[in-house]
Amino acid sequence: MWMRVNRMLGNVSVRQFSNVRLVAQEYSMRVQQARNRIVPKSLTFYSANPLHEEKISRLESLLKKYALPSSQKLPGADISAEENLKQNPRPSWISFSDYALIGGGTRLKPRHYEHFIQLLNKLNNIDPQLVNTEIKNELSKYIKKSSIQSQKTQQKELDEFGRSVAIGKRKAATAKVYLVRGEGKILVNGRQLNDYFLKMKDRESIAYPLQVVDSLGKYNVFATCRGGGPTGQAEAIMHAIAKALLVFNPLLKPRLRKAGVITRDYRHVERKKPGKKKARKMPTWVKR
């Protein structure tokens, strides 16, 4: 009888020991899985729009860090809202479509954008005494870049001989023009204008930019052109002369733009299609 009792107690202890081993193995496995688990870098990874929420949390943290409560004011900061707006004008923020490129794309909703703009305005209205480089750098990311700042076109200057150089294009023709103050000579590929262009229309188109700014007979034009036909070359020279005039006087740009000689004409002859006589003309239909 005592032998049976001892056997039963031994079996129970073995089972308990095996259960403890299983629990320990399971615990170690979970610890290893927790170590190997991929943790997202952003805290907003599991939100509906992580990119937008990350920017919102960044702006809110800056407001909490630097903005004073409404009950507190710095000494010497008793100014009205109008004066504050004059001292710290509100910039033009990026549009909804531009913000969607960096703020979640199709996940971005108009209410998200409104909340984003409200936070930017609050951060921009912080007392100037509290504004630092951290706030300025954050706000500069979302200010709309003007056309002048985005293009950053370098202003051309005259060369050592007092000439302005410009390149114009039209259809398959390309022209390079050297413009210098003089008595009104025009040479094209080393030949006189009347000798190179036989059509009156082509000669008039070359002189048109000078006529627009009342400068006929005040500049010498030396042009080299290649490619295309006579009309294409003439309009390419016209385009180059207009660009060269801006080097002498950039204030002429509105007049030349209104005349339509600053912007390049990108129109080309439409190609012929298979089964058609020309670009769009169909063969004559015959019943038989």
Curated annotation (Swiss-Prot):
Residues 269-288 are annotated as: Disordered. GO terms for biological process: translation. It is found in: Mitochondrion. GO terms for molecular function: RNA binding; structural constituent of ribosome. GO terms for cellular component: mitochondrial small ribosomal subunit. Keywords: Mitochondrion, Ribonucleoprotein, Ribosomal protein, Transit peptide. InterPro entries: Ribosomal_Su5_D2-typ_SF (IPR020568), Ribosomal_uS9 (IPR000754), Ribosomal_uS9_bac/plastid (IPR023035), Ribosomal_uS9_CS (IPR020574), Ribsml_uS5_D2-typ_fold_subgr (IPR014721). Its main location: mitochondrion. Signal peptide: none annotated. Belongs to the universal ribosomal protein uS9 family. NCBIfam families: PRK00132.1. This is Small ribosomal subunit protein uS9m. The gene is MRPS9.
